[in-house]
Amino acid sequence: MDMIIEVVATAVWTMLPAYVPNNVAVLTGGGAPIDGGRTLGGRRILGDGKTWRGTGFGTLAGVAVALGLNTILPILTRVGADLTPFSLEAAVGLAFGAMLGDIVASFFKRRSGRRRGVPFPVIDQLDFVVGGILCAVILAPRWVIATFTPPVVIAVFILTPILHLGTNAGAYVLGFKKEPY
């Protein structure tokens, strides 16, 4: 049981800098869309939901979360937690990669004819995870190899959809989102 708790704690800890950016982007977005309103094949490339401001603030928030977690790590270590600190490269990779993963998914969502806010099952729940991990691999490969053990990766891919759907439902109830998914 202790091993399961350790794996789950590591999975959540490690992914927090990737979990936060898209939520912050929803709260701080608006302004100029990344695609500048351009279309491809008669459809918006990304849509109004992907903005420079949201991407910038989301990335900064994810990096800030990682740095904040590093600040409290000594306290957690004293009570027995065995968690990995974030290098700046890992923090940037996870945060920016989460935003980039969501942007890439939006591109494919538009190509498939889905409008903004229409569900894209599995992709909606995991795009930011894949983007975050891939960018972290590029910027901090040793950190990723040391941190993302196979059990942690499995936990991330199981927990993330549950957390994603739960936070989206909460954001809907609080009026931050127009749909509960």
UniProtKB/Swiss-Prot annotation:
Source superkingdom: Archaea
UniProt cross-references to InterPro entries, sorted A to Z: CarS (IPR032690), CarS_archaea (IPR002726)
Known EC number: 2.7.7.67
Protein location: Cell membrane
Pathway: Membrane lipid metabolism; glycerophospholipid metabolism
Family named by the database record: Belongs to the CDP-archaeol synthase family.
Protein name stated in the entry: CDP-archaeol synthase
Organism the protein comes from: Haloquadratum walsbyi (strain DSM 16790 / HBSQ001)
Lineage summary: Archaea, Methanobacteriati, Methanobacteriota, Stenosarchaea group, Halobacteria
